[in-house]
A protein has these predicted regions:
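Gly/Ala-rich beta-loop-alpha elbow adjacent to hydrolase catalytic centers
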Residues: 1-2
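Helical cap/lid subdomain of alpha/beta-hydrolase-fold lipid enzymes
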Residues: 11-197
Length: 197
């Protein structure tokens, strides 16, 4: 989310007058399916799913959870209907709808392509949640969720979401949490930070 907040500064708050070039590392520019899954299904962080449902309900109160929802259809229901969770609200309780609206507003303010020269550094080739299949009840509420993992991301963010259209790209075969310690990435950062202006 830090990359998206940085883009917001550059694109909407006048940061383009102060920033010449921006390096984006592992940013979920088109959203993160993994974050969505934690909102739909109780995360299994502790053994035996202890406190999983409580954690899911807490995550639903975080504005940032809605800001990183995928901006394209990643879900399919039992009838084959595609679901864009950023645009659709049936999956949420009424008390969460204002947060969804804030997430939509934030995403609408971001430009779809690079406003200044950007470099997108991202991981690829690691199993990453890429889509969800849900079963809904008659009211449209989610009853069950299954998800698909494919080798098309960094374990957290899909490749297609991690680079901004119009930016230079620097892919590395690495997990999301390891991008900052990868030797290839450190060398690219050194090149970027020491280049003449």
């Amino acid at each position: 989310l830090g990359t998206m907040v940085t883009r917001y500064y550059v694109e909407s708050l006048g940061g383009d007058k102060h920033v010449e070039r921006l390096i984006l590392m592992g940013g979920p520019h088109k959203g993160a399916v993994k974050g969505l899954v934690s909102m739909l299904v109780a995360p299994e962080i502790l053994p035996f799913g202890i406190m999983g449902e409580r954690l899911r309900k807490i995550l639903l109160t975080f504005p940032s959870s809605y800001q990183i929802l995928p901006d394209y259809s990643v879900g399919t229901d039992q009838y084959g209907v595609k679901i864009n969770f950023l645009e659709e609200s049936d999956w949420l309780n009424p008390e969460n709808l204002p947060l969804l609206k804030l997430g939509q507003d934030f995403r609408n303010e971001l430009k779809p392509s690079a406003a200044i020269p950007y470099v997108s550094i991202f991981g690829y080739g690691i199993k990453t949640i890429s889509s969800v299949s849900i079963r809904r009840d008659a009211a449209g509420k989610t009853e069950s969720v299954d998800y698909l993992r494919e080798n098309i991301g960094d374990g957290s963010v899909l490749e297609q979401s991690a680079f901004l259209h119009g930016s230079e790209i620097h892919p590395v075969h690495q997990h999301h949490g390891s991008l900052f310690v990868d030797n290839d990435v450190k060398m690219r950062l050194k090149v970027e930070l020491t280049r003449p202006y």
